[in-house]
Amino acid sequence: MGNSSELATLLNTFHSKGLRVLADVVINHCGNRGSWCDFNTMDFGSYGTFYPQSTWITNNDEAQGKCTLGANADDGQHEANYGAARDWDHKNTEVQNMCKAYTQWLKNTIHYDGFRYDYCGGFHVSHINDYNTAAKPYFSVMEYWVGDAAELKTRIDQAGKNTLTFDFALKYNTFRDGIFKKSYTKCLKGGLRGKGYSKYAVTFIDNHDTFARSESEDVANKKDGSSINDKSLMLRCNAYLLSMPGVPCVFYPHWVKYKSELSKMIAARRAAGIHSESTVEEKAESGWYRATIHGTRGNIKLMLGTAAADEQPQGYTLVIKGDDYAMYYNTTPEGVETVNGERLSVKGEKFIQDGQLYIRYGEQLFDGLGRRIQ
């Protein structure tokens, strides 16, 4: 399990490597100690100590008749009244103060950089705006498990545009119903991008809830149709994920199994400067998809389905090509961008090797940040 000192050491190690760390924030519900409505003391150091009472629980919780509950019903918009634990009443001032103290403590005392809010269909998402306003995280994403892009857009607005959300619309409509089934028209304006909200989209193919954890489970229900052992399918999906605007989240089991291929895709995305608001030109029919994605330093061309057999586009370098997918990139003539945003005048042949970007100019070799290697 570890302790707070070991956690602090771990976070410091991540930060020393230039990484930022998110806390998994579960504030929709809380487990009890023994009876229906007895809770642990919440000690958040300088941000306060809280002694949760049964009156902090929503009045339509399963604990009805077991103890005295709060004044308000659950205000969740999608998955209200979580059955396995007590539901906090986020309209209750004490609960609000506790959650604000908790998020500030996580960020400023424990030194997490941001938050992944769990089970956000269980309480009104406007509360996320309140808690983020208090804590000011570097990054925030909410788990609102709905596959409708219009509803996700509405929830982002209700949260004051003060958080991103996992793009379940892309997961279900583009990956499950589109690429998995080679119905490539569903790649057009996929997910929140189709609503002009790609900057608020954390895009993903699978997560710990949707992933088939065993061969028997995979065969039995396909867990939304994905199979990590279908290499062509997984690489088609990841090529789309890592080419498109949004904040892509690579599923760790995919990374472990296909590290070499995914490294090349990530390097190409970085080289071209694809970002959460990159523009996309795209065309598709049922059997194929073609797109050009514009970055700050170049472009990516993505071909799926029968389009993968196209000839290499002029002026582009091949990143990776396989069964029903091909990915190419180019960069601007003036080289690449450094970490601090300065431009370098490194010209020459750009290529990807072992997942890393390099630039060769005569006898000189530079890395992807324009630093001379030899």
Positions of predicted regions on the chain:
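Acidic/aromatic-lined carbohydrate-recognition and catalytic surfaces
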Residues: M1-Y82, W88, F123-M142, G147
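Extended, charge-rich alpha-helical regions
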Residues: D61-T68, T296, T331, G362
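C-terminal outer-membrane/trafficking sorting elements
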Residues: E334-Q374
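Residue-level detector of beta-strand structural context in well-folded domains
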Residues: R86, A239, Y289, G348-E349
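Glycan-binding loop/region signatures in secreted carbohydrate-active enzymes
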Residues: R33-N97, A159-T174, V202-F204, A212, ...
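Short solvent-exposed loop/turn micro-motifs enriched in small/polar/acidic residues
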Residues: N81, M234, A284, E342-L344
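Active-site-proximal helices and loops of the catalytic beta/alpha 8
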Residues: L11, H15, L19, A23, ...
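A conditional alpha-helix N-cap/helix-loop micro-motif detector
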Residues: N3-S4, V95-Q96, D230-K231
